[in-house]
């Protein structure tokens, strides 16, 4: 669990406001967790005329219990017991692919705890990314390696690099998953940083390893992995420029369905440029992971509210366009888990599993690493059903 500790513990200190963050550590996007927000924000603009209004938010008991029951099932000891990230995409065969970043594999004790990770005296496996496939209400874990020695589906190039997952799409029968590569450059707690963006392509029948990995634009400090949306002949890719406080949305697009096409970037004047350097800050207040979804005739941005310090609030903005402006902040939900050492982060939608409205997930975590051993329920996604009017 060394990487999990080194990544989370320094961020926890910084987010709690106990110390200044070294400039080098924040030079590019860190692990997707909420950050100290801006101290002042301008008044919210009116909601877009074509954007829906949030009507009600309720717990999605089916999905929340699906992952709870699966995580507690000890019928296999090389499968999922908790993770964050929680993106999803519908596979061509109709199955649902759940995409995770940091992942615990192994068993759950009868008291609801998990053994420490391998290397800390236990047998819990810790990977930086994994998949789970849902079919007919049943889940199965996808990893590479073997049952005795699981490895990540998106393998690191060496022990000083690793990948965290972003949103995904399907093109030409293959699953295209965005990943952010991080690197360790020293021995100190702060000595790691974002390095680049890539897209990995997976065959639906062989999800344990990519068939190809291609570099994505990475030259200007934007993590192009926050959200993906197909709309009107384009595939829009949403990124975050994470300065700690604030975080800025950026928007790019590719003609057609594949992220391997030619990218163009939204400029400040609303036109598009082939140069990533022209990419404009669309708005602040987004998290590292968020979503943009078409609902009715408008577009809904779902995000944790990073205009507040360690906010438990999930909010929505609306637009008449997939690239904004997104206005009219609406409260969606206040996460009840947020208290003490526990925080929530990175809410986003799963439109392919929604019925009447949107399904939203969010992640739960703790600033105290041993909490993840003590209580397996902490490090698991929660799901919500949101209806609009």
Name these PLM-found stretches.
Residues 1-29:
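Secretory targeting and sorting signals
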Residues 84-87, 149-169, 224-227, 288-291, ...:
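Beta-propeller and closely related beta-sheet repeat lectin domains
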Residues 339-368:
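Short aromatic loop motif centered on NTY/YTY
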Residues 229-232, 296, 353:
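Short, ordered beta-strand-loop transition motifs
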Residues 223-231, 239-241:
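Long, low-complexity, proline- and polar/charged-enriched segments
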